[in-house]
Amino acid sequence: MNGAQVIIQEINREAEQKIKYILDEARKEAEKIKEEARKRGESRAEWILRKAKTQAELEKQRIIATARLEVRRKKLSLQEEYISRVLKEVTSRLSNLSEDEYLETVLALLKEALKELDVKEIRVHSNEKTLALISSRIEEIRRELGDVSIEIGSPIQTIGGVIVETKDGNMRVDNTFEARMARLESELRSKIAEILFG
């Protein structure tokens, strides 16, 4: 049984107890009035009992509605907490890829940017670690990318990935991990929520 069901059951139990108490008090009051009003008729007692039942039902509905809102709020809070954890874990894993895995990722990001920019001369910006990796394996990267001139740009603050721009700086593609995560965040959140919460 999950936490939300436990909360709903507890609130339903409390609501039933409160309703029972209200009805018991109403019955006692009705019996008292019936005794006093036998000569005058029982219509007032019945009216009080009907009113008490109506009040009890309204109270029950109010308690249940409040409980449902609370359960929904807690579920959304829990969902957001789990989604944040997963996104942090993804970010952590991306920043801890092995050199070969990371180079493969950088190549894919460079290819994607080249396709979008449709140029043969680019400048690449990233963190110092990534720029050093690109510099040390530049020939391998050029073979993979084809006839492309690659200039190493200035270092930027990022956990990984690259910003690729034309030599004149007029066009750029931000393929840093942060930018890609931001672009995909709503889709990622939707998928993570579906996996975690069905």
From Swiss-Prot:
Cellular compartments per GO CC: plasma membrane; proton-transporting two-sector ATPase complex, catalytic domain
Membrane topology summary: Peripheral membrane protein
GO BP terms, alphabetized: proton motive force-driven plasma membrane ATP synthesis
SUPFAM superfamilies, per the entry: F1F0 ATP synthase subunit B, membrane domain (SSF81573), V-type ATPase subunit E-like (SSF160527)
InterPro entries, A to Z: ATP_synth_B-like_membr_sf (IPR028987), ATPase_E_C (IPR038495), ATPase_V1_Esu (IPR002842)
Organism ancestry: Archaea, Methanobacteriati, Methanobacteriota, Thermococci, Thermococcales
Compartment(s) of residence: Cell membrane
Protein name listed in UniProt: A-type ATP synthase subunit E
Keyword match Transport: yes
Function summary: Component of the A-type ATP synthase that produces ATP from ADP in the presence of a proton gradient across the membrane.
Subunit architecture: Has multiple subunits with at least A(3), B(3), C, D, E, F, H, I and proteolipid K(x).
Superkingdom of origin organism: Archaea
Entry keywords, A to Z: ATP synthesis, Cell membrane, Hydrogen ion transport, Ion transport, Membrane, Transport
Pfam families named in the record: vATP-synt_E
Entry's Gene Ontology molecular function annotations: ATP binding; proton-transporting ATP synthase activity, rotational mechanism; proton-transporting ATPase activity, rotational mechanism
Family: Belongs to the V-ATPase E subunit family.
